[in-house]
């Protein structure tokens, strides 16, 4: 199911700090909640698991497909925690899954930014937003029509 938070925003073209842009962007799209307070002993959002997962692994190595076990070990957390954050990014259509050969020769599912490029991945997100907005418009029109019919029958 596609899910994304959409808020009015200004492009951050004048900001040169990738971490500032990332933190703002990730809050705006709903990946990180506004006022996010890490549940662990992390000192800041940038030390948190969801932020490091996105920036230090998915964005810093966009061509690599990461397994959940790799990410859990690197981030020193549990597999369910990794899945929770992976699923949130998948719901925004920002990630793709690929088969990955592990060191022991097994094939596992790995995740990376779609096409290894956030800009290209975002085009999928935009397409989903357009479709969702069109469906909302149709639903609003249907509600208006049904309400008008009900008023005429009264």
Named regions from a protein language model:
Residues 45-67:
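Short helix->loop/beta-hairpin flanking segments within DNA-binding domains
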Residues 90-102:
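A short, conserved structural fragment
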């Amino acid at each position: 199911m596609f899910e994304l938070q959409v808020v009015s925003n200004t492009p951050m073209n004048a900001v040169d700090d990738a971490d500032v842009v990332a933190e703002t962007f990730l809050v705006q799209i709903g990946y990180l909640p506004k006022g996010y307070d890490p549940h662990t002993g992390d000192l800041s959002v940038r030390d948190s698991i969801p932020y490091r997962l996105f920036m230090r692994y998915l964005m810093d190595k966009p061509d690599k497909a990461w397994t959940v076990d790799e990410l859990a070990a690197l981030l020193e957390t549990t597999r369910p925690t990794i899945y929770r954050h992976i699923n949130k990014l998948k719901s925004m259509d920002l990630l793709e899954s690929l088969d990955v050969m592990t060191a022991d020769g097994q094939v596992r599912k790995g995740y990376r930014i779609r096409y290894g490029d956030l800009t290209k991945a975002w085009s999928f997100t935009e397409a989903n937003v357009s479709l969702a907005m069109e469906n909302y418009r149709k639903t609003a029109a249907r509600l208006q029509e049904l309400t008008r019919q009900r008023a005429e029958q009264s």
